[in-house]
Amino acid sequence: MSQSYSSNQRASSYRRTFGGGSPSFSTRSSFGSKGASSSSVSSRVYQVSRSTAAPSLSSFRATRVAPVRSSYGADVLDFSLADAMNQEFLQTRTNEKVELQDLNDRFANYIEKVRYLEQQNQILVAEVNRLKGKEPTRVNELYEEEMRELRRQVDLVTNQRARVEVERDNLVDDLQKLKQRLQEEIQLKEDAENNLAAFRGDVDAATLARIDLERRIESLQEEIAFLKKIHEEEIRELQAQFQEQQLQVEIDVSKPDLTAALRDIRAQYENIAAKNVAEAEEWYKSKVSDLNQAAKKNNDAMRQSKQEMMEYRHQIQSYTCEIDALKGTNDSLMRQMRDLEEKFSGEAAGYQDTIGRLEEEIRNMKDEMARHLREYQDLLNVKMALDMEIATYRKLLEGEESRITLPIQTFSALSFRETSPEQRASEVHTKKTVMIKTIETRDGEVLSEASQQHQEIL
Protein backbone atom coordinates (compact mmCIF):
# COMPACT_ATOMS: atom_id res chain seq x y z
CA MET A 1 0.00 0.00 0.00
CA SER A 2 2.85 2.35 0.77
CA GLN A 3 4.44 1.63 -2.56
CA SER A 4 1.22 2.43 -4.38
CA TYR A 5 0.84 5.71 -2.42
CA SER A 6 4.31 6.92 -3.32
CA SER A 7 3.89 5.93 -6.95
CA ASN A 8 0.55 7.72 -7.29
CA GLN A 9 1.97 10.85 -5.64
CA ARG A 10 4.88 11.04 -8.09
CA ALA A 11 2.69 10.37 -11.11
CA SER A 12 0.13 12.97 -10.07
CA SER A 13 2.84 15.53 -9.47
CA TYR A 14 4.34 14.78 -12.86
CA ARG A 15 1.00 14.97 -14.65
CA ARG A 16 0.10 18.20 -12.80
CA THR A 17 3.37 19.76 -13.76
CA PHE A 18 3.99 18.44 -17.33
CA GLY A 19 0.64 17.05 -18.43
CA GLY A 20 -0.18 13.40 -19.28
CA GLY A 21 2.29 10.63 -19.85
CA SER A 22 4.46 8.56 -17.67
CA PRO A 23 7.88 9.66 -16.68
CA SER A 24 10.76 7.42 -17.31
CA PHE A 25 13.01 6.78 -14.30
CA SER A 26 16.44 5.49 -14.59
CA THR A 27 16.09 4.07 -11.11
CA ARG A 28 12.69 3.02 -9.78
CA SER A 29 12.24 3.48 -6.10
CA SER A 30 9.35 4.03 -3.79
CA PHE A 31 8.91 5.88 -0.47
CA GLY A 32 7.91 3.85 2.44
CA SER A 33 5.50 6.26 4.13
CA LYS A 34 4.25 9.82 4.24
CA GLY A 35 6.48 10.54 7.16
CA ALA A 36 9.53 10.56 4.93
CA SER A 37 8.23 13.37 2.74
CA SER A 38 7.13 15.44 5.68
CA SER A 39 10.51 14.92 7.28
CA SER A 40 12.19 16.12 4.09
CA VAL A 41 10.03 19.23 4.00
CA SER A 42 10.73 20.10 7.59
CA SER A 43 14.42 19.55 6.98
CA ARG A 44 14.36 21.86 3.98
CA VAL A 45 12.48 24.55 5.86
CA TYR A 46 15.00 24.28 8.68
CA GLN A 47 17.77 24.79 6.16
CA VAL A 48 16.04 27.88 4.75
CA SER A 49 15.55 29.44 8.15
CA ARG A 50 19.04 28.69 9.43
CA SER A 51 21.43 28.82 6.51
CA THR A 52 22.52 31.84 4.59
CA ALA A 53 23.63 29.73 1.63
CA ALA A 54 21.17 28.34 -0.92
CA PRO A 55 20.34 24.69 -0.31
CA SER A 56 21.38 22.18 -2.94
CA LEU A 57 18.43 21.23 -5.08
CA SER A 58 20.13 18.64 -7.26
CA SER A 59 18.99 15.88 -4.98
CA PHE A 60 15.85 15.33 -2.96
CA ARG A 61 16.96 14.25 0.52
CA ALA A 62 15.10 12.49 3.26
CA THR A 63 16.21 11.79 6.83
CA ARG A 64 14.42 8.58 7.00
CA VAL A 65 13.70 6.35 3.95
CA ALA A 66 11.84 3.10 4.22
CA PRO A 67 13.20 0.04 2.54
CA VAL A 68 12.82 0.46 -1.16
CA ARG A 69 10.67 -2.01 -2.85
CA SER A 70 11.48 -2.05 -6.55
CA SER A 71 9.41 -3.72 -9.14
CA TYR A 72 11.05 -4.22 -12.39
CA GLY A 73 8.45 -5.14 -14.88
CA ALA A 74 8.09 -3.81 -18.40
CA ASP A 75 8.56 -0.13 -17.30
CA VAL A 76 5.19 0.03 -15.46
CA LEU A 77 4.71 2.80 -12.73
CA ASP A 78 2.14 2.73 -9.99
CA PHE A 79 0.08 5.99 -10.38
CA SER A 80 -1.36 5.77 -6.90
CA LEU A 81 2.13 6.49 -5.56
CA ALA A 82 2.37 9.46 -7.94
CA ASP A 83 -0.95 10.82 -6.63
CA ALA A 84 0.29 10.57 -3.06
CA MET A 85 3.51 12.31 -4.00
CA ASN A 86 1.50 14.96 -5.81
CA GLN A 87 -0.61 15.60 -2.71
CA GLU A 88 2.50 15.78 -0.58
CA PHE A 89 4.15 18.10 -3.09
CA LEU A 90 1.06 20.35 -3.11
CA GLN A 91 1.01 20.42 0.69
CA THR A 92 4.69 21.25 0.69
CA ARG A 93 4.21 23.98 -1.89
CA THR A 94 1.32 25.42 0.12
CA ASN A 95 3.40 25.48 3.29
CA GLU A 96 6.32 27.02 1.42
CA LYS A 97 4.00 29.61 -0.10
CA VAL A 98 2.67 30.54 3.34
CA GLU A 99 6.21 30.73 4.68
CA LEU A 100 7.28 32.83 1.72
CA GLN A 101 4.34 35.18 2.26
CA ASP A 102 5.28 35.45 5.91
CA LEU A 103 8.90 36.06 4.94
CA ASN A 104 7.79 38.60 2.33
CA ASP A 105 5.69 40.41 4.93
CA ARG A 106 8.59 40.41 7.36
CA PHE A 107 10.89 41.46 4.58
CA ALA A 108 8.53 44.31 3.65
CA ASN A 109 8.40 45.39 7.30
CA TYR A 110 12.18 45.26 7.47
CA ILE A 111 12.40 47.25 4.25
CA GLU A 112 10.05 49.88 5.68
CA LYS A 113 12.06 49.93 8.88
CA VAL A 114 15.27 50.19 6.88
CA ARG A 115 13.84 53.05 4.84
CA TYR A 116 12.75 54.82 8.01
CA LEU A 117 16.16 54.25 9.60
CA GLU A 118 17.89 55.37 6.40
CA GLN A 119 15.80 58.53 6.43
CA GLN A 120 16.69 59.09 10.08
CA ASN A 121 20.29 58.29 9.24
CA GLN A 122 20.23 60.79 6.38
CA ILE A 123 18.69 63.37 8.71
CA LEU A 124 21.38 62.73 11.30
CA VAL A 125 24.11 62.74 8.65
CA ALA A 126 22.76 66.05 7.34
CA GLU A 127 22.66 67.37 10.92
CA VAL A 128 26.23 66.19 11.53
CA ASN A 129 27.39 67.68 8.23
CA ARG A 130 25.59 70.89 9.07
CA LEU A 131 27.25 70.96 12.48
CA LYS A 132 30.62 70.15 10.88
CA GLY A 133 30.16 72.76 8.16
CA LYS A 134 28.89 75.35 10.54
CA GLU A 135 31.32 78.00 11.67
CA PRO A 136 33.13 77.16 14.86
CA THR A 137 31.14 78.14 17.89
CA ARG A 138 32.06 81.38 19.54
CA VAL A 139 31.32 80.08 23.02
CA ASN A 140 34.99 79.33 23.59
CA GLU A 141 35.98 82.77 22.26
CA LEU A 142 33.34 84.45 24.42
CA TYR A 143 34.52 82.39 27.37
CA GLU A 144 38.16 83.35 26.76
CA GLU A 145 37.22 87.00 26.26
CA GLU A 146 35.16 86.98 29.44
CA MET A 147 38.04 85.31 31.29
CA ARG A 148 40.49 87.92 29.96
CA GLU A 149 38.15 90.71 31.04
CA LEU A 150 37.75 89.13 34.47
CA ARG A 151 41.52 88.68 34.79
CA ARG A 152 42.04 92.31 33.77
CA GLN A 153 39.50 93.48 36.33
CA VAL A 154 41.06 91.26 38.98
CA ASP A 155 44.51 92.70 38.16
CA LEU A 156 43.06 96.22 38.31
CA VAL A 157 41.42 95.51 41.64
CA THR A 158 44.63 93.93 42.91
CA ASN A 159 46.63 97.01 41.83
CA GLN A 160 44.09 99.34 43.42
CA ARG A 161 44.12 97.29 46.58
CA ALA A 162 47.93 97.33 46.66
CA ARG A 163 47.92 101.10 46.10
CA VAL A 164 45.32 101.59 48.84
CA GLU A 165 47.34 99.35 51.17
CA VAL A 166 50.48 101.40 50.41
CA GLU A 167 48.57 104.62 51.12
CA ARG A 168 47.18 103.08 54.28
CA ASP A 169 50.69 102.04 55.37
CA ASN A 170 51.96 105.56 54.64
CA LEU A 171 49.09 107.04 56.63
CA VAL A 172 49.78 104.61 59.46
CA ASP A 173 53.46 105.66 59.40
CA ASP A 174 52.46 109.33 59.41
CA LEU A 175 50.05 108.63 62.24
CA GLN A 176 52.81 106.89 64.21
CA LYS A 177 55.14 109.82 63.59
CA LEU A 178 52.46 112.29 64.66
CA LYS A 179 51.75 110.21 67.75
CA GLN A 180 55.48 110.22 68.53
CA ARG A 181 55.64 113.98 68.02
CA LEU A 182 52.54 114.34 70.18
CA GLN A 183 54.23 112.32 72.92
CA GLU A 184 57.32 114.50 72.59
CA GLU A 185 55.22 117.68 72.75
CA ILE A 186 53.32 116.31 75.74
CA GLN A 187 56.68 115.58 77.40
CA LEU A 188 57.86 119.10 76.59
CA LYS A 189 54.59 120.46 77.95
CA GLU A 190 55.05 118.48 81.15
CA ASP A 191 58.64 119.76 81.42
CA ALA A 192 57.43 123.32 80.85
CA GLU A 193 54.70 122.85 83.46
CA ASN A 194 57.29 121.44 85.85
CA ASN A 195 59.58 124.40 85.14
CA LEU A 196 56.62 126.72 85.54
CA ALA A 197 55.78 125.09 88.85
CA ALA A 198 59.42 125.47 89.90
CA PHE A 199 59.41 129.09 88.72
CA ARG A 200 56.17 129.63 90.60
CA GLY A 201 57.93 128.38 93.73
CA ASP A 202 60.81 130.77 93.06
CA VAL A 203 58.33 133.58 92.42
CA ASP A 204 56.53 132.77 95.63
CA ALA A 205 59.86 132.72 97.49
CA ALA A 206 60.85 136.00 95.85
CA THR A 207 57.47 137.48 96.72
CA LEU A 208 57.85 136.34 100.31
CA ALA A 209 61.37 137.74 100.38
CA ARG A 210 60.10 141.02 98.90
CA ILE A 211 57.32 141.18 101.46
CA ASP A 212 59.82 140.44 104.21
CA LEU A 213 62.12 143.12 102.87
CA GLU A 214 59.24 145.55 102.65
CA ARG A 215 58.36 144.76 106.22
CA ARG A 216 61.99 145.21 107.24
CA ILE A 217 62.08 148.47 105.29
CA GLU A 218 58.95 149.61 107.08
CA SER A 219 60.42 148.57 110.40
CA LEU A 220 63.66 150.34 109.53
CA GLN A 221 61.74 153.41 108.41
CA GLU A 222 59.78 153.32 111.65
CA GLU A 223 63.02 152.85 113.52
CA ILE A 224 64.55 155.73 111.56
CA ALA A 225 61.50 157.85 112.31
CA PHE A 226 61.69 156.84 115.95
CA LEU A 227 65.41 157.60 116.00
CA LYS A 228 64.75 160.91 114.29
CA LYS A 229 62.10 161.67 116.84
CA ILE A 230 64.40 160.68 119.67
CA HIS A 231 67.20 162.67 118.03
CA GLU A 232 64.96 165.69 117.69
CA GLU A 233 63.87 165.36 121.31
CA GLU A 234 67.47 165.02 122.32
CA ILE A 235 68.31 168.02 120.18
CA ARG A 236 65.49 169.95 121.75
CA GLU A 237 66.63 168.87 125.17
CA LEU A 238 70.16 169.73 124.24
CA GLN A 239 69.01 173.07 122.88
CA ALA A 240 67.01 173.66 126.03
CA GLN A 241 70.00 172.66 128.06
CA PHE A 242 72.19 174.82 125.83
CA GLN A 243 69.98 177.79 126.35
CA GLU A 244 69.97 177.18 130.07
CA GLN A 245 73.73 176.72 129.99
CA GLN A 246 74.07 179.85 127.86
CA LEU A 247 72.11 181.72 130.42
CA GLN A 248 74.26 180.27 133.10
CA VAL A 249 77.36 181.15 131.05
CA GLU A 250 76.17 184.63 130.72
CA ILE A 251 75.60 184.64 134.36
CA ASP A 252 78.70 182.79 135.21
CA VAL A 253 81.50 183.75 132.89
CA SER A 254 83.91 181.67 134.69
CA LYS A 255 82.22 178.41 133.64
CA PRO A 256 83.69 176.55 130.62
CA ASP A 257 82.24 177.11 127.07
CA LEU A 258 79.69 174.33 126.31
CA THR A 259 78.56 175.60 122.90
CA ALA A 260 81.47 174.10 121.04
CA ALA A 261 80.95 170.83 122.83
CA LEU A 262 77.26 170.81 121.92
CA ARG A 263 78.11 171.63 118.33
CA ASP A 264 80.57 168.83 118.24
CA ILE A 265 78.08 166.44 119.79
CA ARG A 266 75.35 167.64 117.42
CA ALA A 267 77.66 167.27 114.46
CA GLN A 268 78.66 163.82 115.59
CA TYR A 269 75.04 162.75 116.05
CA GLU A 270 74.05 164.28 112.74
CA ASN A 271 76.92 162.51 111.02
CA ILE A 272 75.98 159.25 112.71
CA ALA A 273 72.29 159.70 111.77
CA ALA A 274 73.14 160.69 108.19
CA LYS A 275 75.50 157.79 107.94
CA ASN A 276 72.84 155.39 109.26
CA VAL A 277 70.21 156.84 106.94
CA ALA A 278 72.56 156.61 103.96
CA GLU A 279 73.51 153.08 104.83
CA ALA A 280 69.86 152.10 105.33
CA GLU A 281 68.82 153.76 102.09
CA GLU A 282 71.70 152.18 100.23
CA TRP A 283 70.94 148.77 101.69
CA TYR A 284 67.24 149.23 100.95
CA LYS A 285 67.97 150.36 97.40
CA SER A 286 70.33 147.43 96.84
CA LYS A 287 67.80 144.98 98.23
CA VAL A 288 64.99 146.53 96.22
CA SER A 289 67.18 146.48 93.11
CA ASP A 290 68.06 142.84 93.71
CA LEU A 291 64.41 141.99 94.32
CA ASN A 292 63.37 143.95 91.25
CA GLN A 293 65.96 142.17 89.15
CA ALA A 294 64.90 138.78 90.54
CA ALA A 295 61.23 139.67 89.98
CA LYS A 296 62.04 140.89 86.49
CA LYS A 297 63.90 137.67 85.75
CA ASN A 298 61.06 135.67 87.19
CA ASN A 299 58.55 137.70 85.20
CA ASP A 300 60.58 137.21 82.03
CA ALA A 301 60.83 133.49 82.72
CA MET A 302 57.10 133.34 83.48
CA ARG A 303 56.30 135.34 80.37
CA GLN A 304 58.57 133.10 78.27
CA SER A 305 57.08 129.99 79.88
CA LYS A 306 53.56 131.29 79.22
CA GLN A 307 54.51 132.08 75.64
CA GLU A 308 56.04 128.63 75.16
CA MET A 309 53.02 127.07 76.83
CA MET A 310 50.72 128.97 74.47
CA GLU A 311 52.82 127.85 71.50
CA TYR A 312 52.73 124.28 72.75
CA ARG A 313 48.99 124.52 73.19
CA HIS A 314 48.60 125.83 69.66
CA GLN A 315 50.84 123.06 68.34
CA ILE A 316 48.91 120.46 70.32
CA GLN A 317 45.65 121.83 68.98
CA SER A 318 46.98 121.81 65.41
CA TYR A 319 48.36 118.29 65.86
CA THR A 320 45.08 117.18 67.38
CA CYS A 321 43.17 118.64 64.44
CA GLU A 322 45.61 117.03 62.01
CA ILE A 323 45.31 113.67 63.81
CA ASP A 324 41.51 113.95 63.72
CA ALA A 325 41.67 114.76 60.00
CA LEU A 326 44.03 111.84 59.38
CA LYS A 327 41.77 109.56 61.42
CA GLY A 328 38.79 110.68 59.34
CA THR A 329 40.78 110.14 56.14
CA ASN A 330 41.93 106.73 57.35
CA ASP A 331 38.36 105.78 58.31
CA SER A 332 37.05 106.92 54.92
CA LEU A 333 39.81 105.01 53.14
CA MET A 334 39.09 101.91 55.21
CA ARG A 335 35.38 102.23 54.38
CA GLN A 336 36.21 102.68 50.70
CA MET A 337 38.52 99.67 50.83
CA ARG A 338 35.83 97.56 52.51
CA ASP A 339 33.26 98.75 49.98
CA LEU A 340 35.65 97.95 47.14
CA GLU A 341 36.41 94.54 48.61
CA GLU A 342 32.70 93.77 49.01
CA LYS A 343 31.98 95.07 45.51
CA PHE A 344 34.81 93.14 43.92
CA SER A 345 34.00 90.01 45.92
CA GLY A 346 30.39 90.25 44.70
CA GLU A 347 31.54 90.83 41.13
CA ALA A 348 34.02 87.96 41.41
CA ALA A 349 31.25 85.70 42.73
CA GLY A 350 29.04 86.78 39.81
CA TYR A 351 31.85 86.12 37.37
CA GLN A 352 32.48 82.74 38.97
CA ASP A 353 28.78 81.93 38.59
CA THR A 354 28.94 83.04 34.94
CA ILE A 355 32.04 80.90 34.39
CA GLY A 356 30.35 77.93 36.05
CA ARG A 357 27.24 78.44 33.93
CA LEU A 358 29.30 78.66 30.74
CA GLU A 359 31.28 75.56 31.70
CA GLU A 360 28.01 73.76 32.45
CA GLU A 361 26.67 74.81 29.03
CA ILE A 362 29.89 73.57 27.39
CA ARG A 363 29.61 70.25 29.25
CA ASN A 364 25.96 69.96 28.26
CA MET A 365 26.85 70.67 24.63
CA LYS A 366 29.63 68.08 24.77
CA ASP A 367 27.28 65.56 26.35
CA GLU A 368 24.65 66.30 23.72
CA MET A 369 27.24 65.95 20.95
CA ALA A 370 28.42 62.66 22.46
CA ARG A 371 24.81 61.49 22.72
CA HIS A 372 24.24 62.39 19.05
CA LEU A 373 27.40 60.52 18.14
CA ARG A 374 26.28 57.49 20.16
CA GLU A 375 22.86 57.60 18.52
CA TYR A 376 24.55 57.93 15.16
CA GLN A 377 26.81 54.98 15.99
CA ASP A 378 23.81 52.94 17.17
CA LEU A 379 21.93 53.78 13.98
CA LEU A 380 24.96 52.80 11.93
CA ASN A 381 25.13 49.51 13.80
CA VAL A 382 21.40 48.93 13.28
CA LYS A 383 21.78 49.83 9.62
CA MET A 384 24.66 47.40 9.20
CA ALA A 385 22.68 44.68 10.97
CA LEU A 386 19.68 45.38 8.76
CA ASP A 387 21.89 45.41 5.68
CA MET A 388 23.25 42.03 6.71
CA GLU A 389 19.73 40.72 7.34
CA ILE A 390 18.52 42.10 4.01
CA ALA A 391 21.46 40.46 2.25
CA THR A 392 20.62 37.21 4.02
CA TYR A 393 16.99 37.41 2.97
CA ARG A 394 18.03 38.34 -0.54
CA LYS A 395 20.21 35.27 -0.74
CA LEU A 396 17.41 33.18 0.71
CA LEU A 397 14.97 34.54 -1.85
CA GLU A 398 17.43 34.03 -4.69
CA GLY A 399 18.03 30.47 -3.52
CA GLU A 400 14.30 29.84 -3.22
CA GLU A 401 13.67 31.28 -6.68
CA SER A 402 16.44 29.15 -8.15
CA ARG A 403 14.94 26.14 -6.42
CA ILE A 404 11.46 26.94 -7.74
CA THR A 405 12.60 27.65 -11.31
CA LEU A 406 14.67 24.47 -11.48
CA PRO A 407 13.62 22.37 -14.53
CA ILE A 408 11.37 19.54 -13.55
CA GLN A 409 13.25 17.23 -15.95
CA THR A 410 15.83 16.81 -13.22
CA PHE A 411 13.14 15.18 -11.17
CA SER A 412 13.87 11.93 -13.03
CA ALA A 413 17.45 12.10 -11.94
CA LEU A 414 16.58 12.24 -8.26
CA SER A 415 18.26 9.63 -6.23
CA PHE A 416 16.57 8.96 -2.96
CA ARG A 417 19.12 8.23 -0.34
CA GLU A 418 19.28 8.45 3.37
CA THR A 419 21.09 11.53 4.66
CA SER A 420 22.42 11.70 8.15
CA PRO A 421 22.05 14.88 10.26
CA GLU A 422 25.85 15.22 10.30
CA GLN A 423 25.94 15.37 6.48
CA ARG A 424 23.11 17.90 6.46
CA ALA A 425 24.87 20.06 8.95
CA SER A 426 28.06 19.92 6.89
CA GLU A 427 26.25 21.41 3.90
CA VAL A 428 24.84 24.34 5.88
CA HIS A 429 27.17 27.33 5.66
CA THR A 430 26.79 30.43 7.80
CA LYS A 431 28.63 33.57 6.90
CA LYS A 432 29.52 35.87 9.83
CA THR A 433 30.41 39.46 9.05
CA VAL A 434 32.10 41.54 11.77
CA MET A 435 32.53 45.27 11.20
CA ILE A 436 34.70 47.28 13.60
CA LYS A 437 34.18 51.00 13.31
CA THR A 438 36.48 53.38 15.19
CA ILE A 439 35.46 57.01 15.70
CA GLU A 440 37.89 59.39 17.44
CA THR A 441 36.32 62.46 19.01
CA ARG A 442 37.68 65.38 20.96
CA ASP A 443 35.49 67.96 22.72
CA GLY A 444 32.44 66.68 20.86
CA GLU A 445 34.07 66.95 17.40
CA VAL A 446 34.80 63.97 15.18
CA LEU A 447 38.51 63.87 14.39
CA SER A 448 38.84 60.61 12.47
CA GLU A 449 36.68 57.68 11.44
CA ALA A 450 37.85 54.22 10.35
CA SER A 451 36.06 50.91 9.74
CA GLN A 452 37.27 47.32 9.31
CA GLN A 453 35.19 44.41 8.04
CA HIS A 454 35.94 40.72 8.60
CA GLN A 455 33.98 37.80 7.13
CA GLU A 456 33.99 34.31 8.55
CA ILE A 457 32.23 31.25 7.11
CA LEU A 458 31.04 28.89 9.82
Curated annotation (Swiss-Prot):
Linker 1: annotated span: 130-139
Subcellular location field: Cytoplasm, Myofibril, Sarcomere, Z line; Cytoplasm; Cell membrane, Sarcolemma
Residue numbers spanned by region Tail: 401-458
Region named Linker 12: 241-256
Domain IF rod per the UniProt entry, residue ranges: 96-404
Positions bearing the site annotation: Stutter: 342
UniProt-listed InterPro entries: IF_conserved (IPR018039), IF_rod_dom (IPR039008), Intermed_filament_DNA-bd (IPR006821), Intermediate_filament (IPR050405)
Biological processes annotated in GO: intermediate filament organization; skeletal muscle organ development
GO cellular component, one term: intermediate filament
UniProt family annotation: Belongs to the intermediate filament family.
UniProt protein name: Desmin
Species of origin: Xenopus laevis (African clawed frog)
